[in-house]
A protein has these predicted regions:
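Active-site flanking residues adjacent to catalytic metal/cofactor-binding acidic residues
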Residues: 7, 30, 122-124, 239-240, ...
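Hydrophobic anchor at the start of a short beta-strand
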Residues: 25-27, 121, 174
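Conserved N-terminal helical subregion
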Residues: 50-54, 58-144, 148, 152, ...
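C-terminal helical "tail/cap" subdomain of flavin- and related membrane-associated enzymes
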Residues: 265-344
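FAD/FMN-dependent oxidoreductases across multiple families
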Residues: 187-274
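Conserved FAD-binding catalytic core of PHBH/FMO-like flavoproteins
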Residues: 123-219
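Glycine-rich FAD cofactor-binding loop and adjacent beta-loop-alpha segment at the N-terminus
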Residues: 3-5, 9-67
Length: 344
C-alpha cells in the first residue's frame, strides 16, 4: 500500500510529488486527464520562485520578471507603486504560462492512471465541484497583448467599477487578465480585434501606451470556493481543491504551492503520514496563511468594485495612503509575496 496518493498532476500536485521524492515515503501521482491546457498566464511570487528552485525546476523555466507594479483606479484619484527594492527582493514576481510551468514540472515526475490504496490521499485535482462558494458578478478575459511601446518589467493593476484589469509583462508583450460583467465579457471575447482594443485602451487609460494586437482571447468565470475542512479523515485538500480564488493580485497558484510545500514538510517528518495528529498539524499550519490570503483576495475583488462616489473615494484614499506611507506599502508587498507565514 502507498503512503501518499496525490490525485491531480497539475502544478500543485507535481510540486508536492517533487517535494516528497527524497522523503522515503511511497508516493504515487495520479493524472486523470491529459488534455492540453489553454493559454493561462501565471504570476509566480518570489516565494514561489524559492520553492521551485528547491524543487529543481526553476532554472529551466522561461519567465519575465516584475520589478514594479503600478496600481491605479479608473476615472478617479488614487495610485501607488510597489517596487521590488522596497520589499527587499530581486523581483516582486515572475510571469509565465501555465503550460510552460506544467511541462517543467511534469518532466521530473512520473504519473499514473491506476488508482491504488494509500494511507494518505491528497486532493490536488482542481476546484471543488461539491462546494457552492460565491460567484462573483464578473468573468475574466485572458489574452496576450502586444503594445506600443513593448512591455518591460512593469506590471499594471487598474481597478475599475466592473472589476480589476491586470497587465503583466511576458516576453515583450502583456498577459491580460481583465475582469468585468459576464455579459460584457461574452461580447468582447467575440468582437473584432479593433473594437476590443478600443475598449481596452480606453480602460487602461494610457498606462501601457497603446495596445496594438490581441491573441488567445478566452473567458473564465470567476468564483470564490473554499472547502469547509482542509483535512477529512485521511484525505487532505490543497491548492484549488481547497480554495479557488479570484485572479486579482495573482494569489491562487502561489497559495497552492505554499500548501504543497508545507504538506511535504509535515509528511516528510512524521512517523505515519496519515496519523490524525500529522494531518491536524498541517491544517493548523495552513490556517493563518490561507485565511488571510482568501480574505485579502475577496476584499480586492469585491470591495474594490462598484461605482459610487463613496467607494471611489475609499479606494482612492487607500491607494494614496499606500503611496505616502512606506511601512504599510512594504507590508502589503511582502504579504502578496510570502503570504501570512514565512517558508519553513
Amino acid at each position: 500500500m502507498l503512503d501518499v496518493l496525490i490525485r491531480g498532476a497539475g502544478p500543485v500536485g507535481c510540486a508536492l510529488a517533487l517535494a516528497l521524492r527524497n522523503s522515503g515515503l511511497r508516493v504515487a501521482l495520479l493524472e486523470a486527464s491529459s488534455a492540453p491546457p489553454a493559454f493561462r498566464p501565471l504570476a509566480l511570487s518570489y516565494a514561489s520562485r524559492l520553492i521551485l528552485e528547491r524543487l529543481g525546476v526553476w532554472s529551466g523555466l522561461n519567465v519575465s520578471p516584475i520589478e514594479r507594479i503600478l496600481v491605479s483606479q479608473a476615472a478617479s484619484f488614487g495610485r501607488t507603486r510597489l517596487d521590488a527594492a522596497d520589499a527587499g527582493v530581486p523581483a516582486l514576481g515572475y510571469v509565465t504560462d501555465y503550460a510552460a510551468l506544467l511541462a517543467q514540472l511534469r518532466a521530473q515526475v512520473t504519473t499514473t492512471t491506476e488508482v491504488s490504496e494509500a494511507s494518505c490521499i491528497v486532493h490536488a485535482e482542481g476546484a471543488p465541484q461539491d462546494t457552492e462558494g460565491k460567484r462573483y458578478a464578473q468573468d475574466a478575459i485572458v489574452g496576450l497583448l502586444q503594445a506600443e511601446p513593448p512591455s518591460t518589467a512593469t506590471a499594471f493593476e487598474r481597478f475599475t467599477p466592473e472589476g480589476p484589469l491586470a497587465l503583466l509583462p511576458l516576453a515583450g508583450r502583456y498577459a491580460l487578465i481583465w475582469s468585468m460583467r459576464p455579459e460584457r465579457a461574452a461580447r468582447l471575447v467575440a468582437t473584432s480585434e479593433a473594437e476590443f482594443l478600443r475598449e481596452l485602451n480606453a480602460v487602461a487609460g494610457g498606462a501601457i501606451g497603446r495596445g496594438t494586437t490581441i491573441e488567445k482571447r478566452a473567458v473564465q468565470p470567476l468564483a470564490l470556493k473554499v472547502r469547509g475542512a482542509r483535512v477529512e479523515g485521511n484525505e487532505v485538500y490543497i491548492g484549488n481543491a481547497a480554495q479557488t480564488l479570484h485572479p486579482v493580485a495573482g494569489q491562487g497558484l502561489n497559495l497552492g504551492l505554499r500548501d504543497a510545500w508545507d504538506l511535504a514538510h509535515v509528511l516528510g517528518r512524521a512517523p505515519a503520514a496519515a496519523a490524525p495528529a500529522t494531518l491536524a498539524r498541517f491544517a493548523a499550519q495552513r490556517r493563518l496563511d490561507a485565511g488571510a490570503t482568501i480574505r485579502m483576495t475577496d476584499f480586492l475583488a469585491a470591495g474594490f468594485a462598484g461605482d459610487n462616489a463613496l467607494l471611489r473615494a475609499a479606494r482612492g484614499a487607500a491607494l494614496t495612503a499606500l503611496d505616502i506611507f512606506p511601512a504599510p506599502r512594504r507590508f502589503f508587498a511582502r504579504r502578496m509575496i510570502f503570504g501570512a507565514a514565512a517558508l519553513p
